[in-house]
Amino acid sequence: MKLFCGVIALACVPAATAGHNVPYPEEKVAEFVVEKLDVNTIPYVMRPKKDKGKKTFSDYGYVTQRADEKEALVEAAPGRRVAVRVLEQAQDGIYVCIDGLGKKASDGRIQRVLLLQWRGPDGLLKGKESSKNFNSCQVIGGLDDVTAGSSY
């Protein structure tokens, strides 16, 4: 019986993980990222104030100023700019450098490496800060309010 359960479990693993191996585009990757990125998943000090029903740059009124294969620049009306640079495409997702100004003037310029993951054509890219280092994208700027807490 234990052998049978083990065989069933091994048979189900590929089906369970199949949804995570969605192919990412090979061309116009930066444009794809700008269109599909859920901006509510980028670091707090860089993202726009959460607004119900809004998730993408275009939902928040950002307009793409420039886009090529590996880099895009989006800008909102009050002069807020965010640069998105594709660093690496890997099996686990797309590594990007997000570069822009913080919410407050005192935040200054902020730059972070994010790992973006996509669940499929109907979903959005979800970002999380990556610990992977890239020489072309050093961590710059303020701390998230969430991570700046006590060390106790």
Enumerate the language-model features and the residues they cover.
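Exposed acidic/polar residues on beta-strands and adjacent loops within beta-sheet cores, strongest
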Residues: A18-Y152
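Sec-dependent signal peptide recognition
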Residues: M1-A9
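N-terminal signal peptide c-region/cleavage motif recognized by signal peptidases
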Residues: C12-A16
